[in-house]
Amino acid sequence: MKKHTGTIISISGFVLRIEFNESELPEIGFALEYHTHQGTYLAEVVQHTGINTVSAIAIGEVSGLARGTEVVNLGHPIEVPVGETVQGRMLNVYGKAIDGKPEPAAEVKWPIFRAQPLLRELDTNKEILYTGIKVIDLICPILKGGKTGLFGGAGVGKSVLMQELINNISMLGGNSVFTGVGERVREGIGLYKELEASGVLPQTTVVLGQMNESPGVRMRVALTGLTIAEYLRDEEKKDVLLFIDNVFRFIQAGSEVSSLQGKIPITGGYQSTLSKEVGDFQDRIASTKNGSITSIQCVFLPADDIDDPSAVATFSHLDSTIVLERSIAALGIFPAVNPLQSFSRALNPTFVGERHYQLAVQVKFILQRYMELQEIINVLGMAELSDEDRKLVHRARKIRNFLSQPFYVSEKFTGTEGTFVEIEDLLGSIERILNGDYDERSERDFLFIGSYKDLK
C-alpha cells in the first residue's frame, strides 16, 4: 500500500502543523513518521485544521526539526509488539527495546487505541488477592481483576509500597506489566534489576516513558503498557498484573497537550476532557471471561490535596483506595497508610468473611475514637481520660504500630528482614490486641513486626 507524505509547515513546541494533499488527509489518531538528526520518531494526528492541513502532537523529540521536513502517514495508529516476544524486556512508548538487547520480534502488533470490552464479555466473579502487607489485607483488600489506587503526596512512600506489592504479588506467579509514566528513570532501572535478581523478569514487561520526555510520550506510554496487558488477557487468556506509576503524570501530560493545542482549561489548569480521558483509559482495564487484569496504580497528590481534580477523576473507577498520609510517615510508621481514609469494595462479609469484616470494623472504630480523643490528650493530657478511654488509646496505638511492616524491597537500607504476613496470622494478631491480651506490653513492641508470633 502506498504511504502518503506531507510537509511540516509550522512547529509550536510539540505541536506540528502538517500539509497533505486534500485526498490524502490522515485520520484522527493515525501515526505520522518523521526524522531528525536524533533518530526516527512518530507524531499523532489530533485535529484537522483545514481542507488539507492537520495538527499533530510529537510522540518524541522535536529538536532539530524544521519547516519543510517530510512526514509519512503510516495509515494506522501507533502499533506495538505484543505477546511472548516482549516478556522479560524493557520497552519505550513505541515498543522499542531500551534494555540494550536486540529489538523484540514484531510477530504480532496491536494498535494502542482499542475499544473497551463489551458488557457481555465482562466477568464479575471476584476473589481477594492477598498481598502479605498487613494494613492492605486488613483494611483495603485488593480484588483479583480489580483496580487499586495508591494516593499520596511526594515522599510518603508510594513507589516503595508499589515495589513491595510487585515483589509480593509476583511471587504468586502469573504475568506482569509495569508501566512507568513520567517517573524517574532510576526507579525504572532499579525495578528492572530487582525483577531480574528475583527471577520474575521472564514473566514481566517493563514499559517506560520518562520524566524528561515529551508530553506526547508520557500521555501514550500508559496505553502501550495497557495494550500489552490486553493481549495477554484476550489472546493468551491469562491473568495479568498491571502496575502503573504514575497516573497523575498521565493526566498531567494530557493537560500539557491540551494547553499546547490552545484549549481552555478547567479548575486547577487541567484539560476540559479530563474525565473522558481517564474514563477511556480506566474502562479498558477490566476482567473478561478470557482472563483478568488486576491493576495497581500510583496517583500523586499535588500539595497532599485529596480533592485535587486529578484524584477525583480517578476515584470513581477504583475498587480499592489506599491513602498514604504525611503525618503517619512523620511518626516513622511505614507503610504510611491512613486506615480511616482508605477503603475497599471488597471489605464486606461476602468477599472476606464475617470474622475479617468485623475485625476491620472494630479497628476502624477504635482508630477513629483515638483520633477524637487525641485533641483532649494534646490539651489536657492522658490523666483527664476515663480508665476505659485510656485503655482504648493504648490499644489504638498498638494497632497503629502493628500495621507498620518491614519490606523486602527496603531490606538493604533498613537491615531488617522483610515479612509476608499470612491472613490468618494477621487476623489472629488483631484479635489478641483487641481482646486485651497485650495490654501490659509496650506500644513499641509492635513496631515493624510480622505477627503476634514475632513478639518476644
UniProtKB/Swiss-Prot annotation:
SUPFAM superfamilies: C-terminal domain of alpha and beta subunits of F1 ATP synthase, N-terminal domain of alpha and beta subunits of F1 ATP synthase, P-loop containing nucleoside triphosphate hydrolases
Catalytic activity: ATP + H2O + 4 H(+)(in) = ADP + phosphate + 5 H(+)(out)
EC number: 7.1.2.2
Cited CDD domains: ATP-synt_F1_beta_C, ATP-synt_F1_beta_N, F1-ATPase_beta_CD
Pfam annotation, one family: ATP-synt_ab
Complex formation: F-type ATPases have 2 components, CF(1) - the catalytic core - and CF(0) - the membrane proton channel. CF(1) has five subunits: alpha(3), beta(3), gamma(1), delta(1), epsilon(1). CF(0) has three main subunits: a(1), b(2) and c(9-12). The alpha and beta chains form an alternating ring which encloses part of the gamma chain. CF(1) is attached to CF(0) by a central stalk formed by the gamma and epsilon chains, while a peripheral stalk is formed by the delta and b chains.
Name of the protein: ATP synthase subunit beta 1
Keyword Protein biosynthesis found: no
The keyword ATP-binding appears for this protein: yes
Cellular component annotations (GO), alphabetically ordered: plasma membrane; proton-transporting ATP synthase complex
Xref: PROSITE patterns: ATPASE_ALPHA_BETA (PS00152)
Subcellular location: Cell membrane
InterPro entries, sorted: AAA+_ATPase, ATP-synt_VA_C, ATP_synth_F1_bsu, ATPase_a/bsu_AS, ATPase_alpha/beta_chains, ATPase_F1/V1/A1_a/bsu_N, ATPase_F1/V1/A1_a/bsu_N_sf, ATPase_F1/V1/A1_a/bsu_nucl-bd
Enzyme class: translocase
Organism for this UniProt entry: Listeria monocytogenes serovar 1/2a (strain ATCC BAA-679 / EGD-e)
Its membrane topology: Peripheral membrane protein
